[in-house]
């Protein structure tokens, strides 16, 4: 373990600037990859598919249009969809009923649709709607809209539009709420022009956009073209008879603040009454965050004085803005005073770790260990449970070379005070640090933990590998795998290799991921469905969509990847 820690600490030290991948990664010229090397790797992948997967093997889910894998779980094999067999049985039963000419139960079918959406099995959810319609059942409007919304949230706007068109062809008109989901989906994809054209078509159909429609368009406008263009768009909407609400103006306030145009935001804020709107707590919070960030404390105080009740009474968000800003500017005493005021007076908000973490982070950055301990003791006394942000704040003590042991003692003390299982608590801390890209602190604390008897398991090593990959230190991640291989107690598992493969696929180095895959097979680690799903998604992520489809079809025929995973990948990358 000490060999591992020493070898990786030297690479992960924040003093070695700039951070970049070295070793086998750095020897490959930029842009070297591509179709040929991936194609060669594909042959090796297909050659490995000699064993049929058991139904228990889980598929790794990559959701969102920007291809963001879910790294929140501790292990790639953890599958939140523990009831998938029941869903499959229920779906098969529904299909049998309808094909047999029977009408299914509306409530049961609707619940199945919701459950499939929650399990990210959207293609089957669409099929449920189709089966209901073909059997003469009118789908519940809220369930139908929910499915459209889920498709759009995951970037599958094309599928959502096709579904809406099919439903309309069958005589099921959509309402503004459903269309708003489509507008929002298009806006999320950065397609403002397409969104505007879509809204025009809706108006020609006789559907009137509402204030939420305008808010989605305005947000897309300031993100794509700047806030001035968003203001022009709002003016056009009003000229055409549109009636925006306060949410629309709050969007513009946010746009000005994100562009650092605090004075313009304040000017618009003061114009709200003349436009027929009374600012609410959201409006005030937007301005307050901007003023505090700029250190304009007198103006912030004046704004706070106006928040005297009703819709503009301070919220827990208001207090957290103040605490975060004060701590950021080094005013920790004032931040702590605001913390105390949160639970006094008429409001008495419940304090959480989110409120304490900025103060702890600042104190750790300044190396004030005694005050950190005092603050954490106060948290525990107030039954405020530390979270991932707390651990990362404490991890920043490791930036002071002389404070590493103090950081460990604080972590150790937190474990004892919360009466946690030490092994599980340490594992959680390391995972939290790695997830946020604080791998250097993770290794330093891990070294102290092992000196006190902590024995890292495969889960912990996967967290380290993912953390190193997240920070671009692939040689370090490979070193972890190599040292695990030499260890007698903790050989690398399939999950460890999957973590490495995923890290390479995320930076469009699927060729190198194929090499790690080959190493995995050579070392007798049998790939699972997760492994193959990551590789196919990696190929698709490099825009080699035809190759990805061919590989996916072949893997499905060889029964090493299940239909649920196939449906998910096909929808994600439009491989139909």
Swiss-Prot record:
It comes from the Eukaryota. GO terms for cellular component: chloroplast. InterPro entries: Pentatricopeptide_rpt (IPR002885), PPR-containing_protein (IPR050667), TPR-like_helical_dom_sf (IPR011990). It comes from Arabidopsis thaliana (Mouse-ear cress). Keywords: Chloroplast, Plastid, Repeat, Transit peptide. PPR repeats lie at residues 105-139, 140-174, 175-209, 210-244, 245-279, 280-314, 315-349, 352-386, 387-417, 422-456, 457-487, 493-527, 528-562. SUPFAM superfamilies: HCP-like. This is Pentatricopeptide repeat-containing protein At1g79080, chloroplastic. The keyword Transit peptide applies. One of its GO terms (molecular function) is mRNA binding. PANTHER family: MEMBRANE-ASSOCIATED SALT-INDUCIBLE PROTEIN-LIKE (PTHR47939), OS04G0684500 PROTEIN (PTHR47939:SF1). Signal peptide: none annotated.
């Amino acid at each position: 373990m000490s060999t591992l820690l020493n070898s990786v600490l030297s690479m992960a030290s924040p003093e070695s600037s700039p951070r970049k991948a070295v070793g086998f990664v750095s020897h490959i010229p930029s842009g070297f990859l591509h179709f040929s090397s991936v194609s060669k790797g594909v042959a090796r992948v297909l050659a490995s598919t000699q064993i049929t997967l058991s139904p228990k093997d889980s598929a790794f889910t990559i959701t969102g249009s920007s291809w963001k894998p879910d790294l929140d779980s501790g292990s790639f094999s953890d599958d939140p969809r523990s009831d998938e067999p029941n869903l499959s049985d229920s779906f098969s039963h529904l299909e049998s009923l309808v094909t047999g000419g029977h009408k299914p139960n509306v409530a049961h079918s609707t619940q199945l649709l919701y459950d499939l959406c929650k399990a990210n099995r959207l293609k089957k959810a669409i099929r449920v709607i189709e089966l209901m319609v073909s059997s003469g059942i009118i789908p519940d409007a809220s369930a139908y809209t929910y499915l459209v919304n889920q498709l759009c949230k995951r970037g599958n706007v094309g599928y959502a539009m096709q579904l809406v068109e099919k439903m309309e062809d069958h005589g099921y008109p959509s309402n503004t709420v459903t269309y708003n989901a489509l507008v929002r989906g298009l806006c999320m994809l950065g397609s403002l022009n397409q969104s505007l054209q879509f809204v025009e078509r809706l108006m020609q159909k006789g559907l009137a956009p509402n204030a939420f429609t305008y808010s989605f368009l305005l947000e897309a406008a300031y993100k794509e073209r700047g806030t001035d263009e968003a203001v022009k768009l709002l003016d056009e909407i009003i000229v055409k008879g549109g009636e925006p609400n306060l949410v629309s103006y709050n969007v513009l306030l946010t746009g000005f603040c994100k562009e650092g145009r605090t004075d313009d935001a304040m000017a618009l804020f003061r114009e709200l009454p003349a436009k027929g709107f009374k600012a609410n707590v959201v409006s005030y919070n937007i301005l307050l965050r901007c003023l505090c960030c700029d250190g304009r404390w007198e103006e912030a105080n004046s704004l706070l004085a106006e928040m005297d009740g009703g819709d503009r009474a301070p919220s827990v968000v208001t207090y957290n803005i103040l605490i975060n800003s004060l701590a950021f500017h080094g005013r920790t005493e004032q931040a702590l005073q605001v913390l105390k005021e949160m639970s006094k007076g008429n409001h008495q908000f419940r304090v959480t770790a989110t409120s304490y973490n900025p103060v702890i982070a600042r104190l750790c950055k300044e190396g004030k260990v005694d005050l950190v301990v005092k603050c954490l003791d106060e948290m525990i006394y107030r039954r405020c449970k530390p979270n991932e942000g707390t651990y990362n704040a404490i991890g920043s003590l490791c930036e002071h070379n002389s404070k590493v042991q103090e950081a460990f003692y604080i972590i150790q003390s937190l474990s004892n005070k919360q009466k946690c299982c030490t092994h599980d608590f340490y594992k959680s801390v390391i995972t939290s640090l790695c997830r946020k890209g604080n791998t250097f602190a993770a290794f330093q604390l891990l070294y102290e933990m092992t000196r006190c008897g902590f024995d890292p398991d495969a889960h912990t090593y996967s967290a380290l590998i993912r953390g190193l990959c997240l920070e671009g230190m692939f040689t370090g991640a490979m070193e972890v795998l190599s040292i695990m291989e030499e260890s007698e107690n903790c050989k690398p598992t399939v999950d460890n290799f999957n973590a490495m493969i995923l890290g390479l696929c995320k930076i469009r180095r699927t060729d190198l991921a194929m090499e790690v895959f080959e190493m995995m097979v050579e070392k007798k680690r049998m790939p699972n469905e997760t492994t193959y799903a990551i590789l196919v998604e990696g190929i698709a992520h490099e825009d080699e969509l035809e190759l990805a489809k061919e590989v996916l079809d072949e893997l499905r025929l060889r029964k090493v990847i299940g239909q649920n995973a196939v449906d998910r990948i096909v929808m994600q990358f439009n491989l139909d």
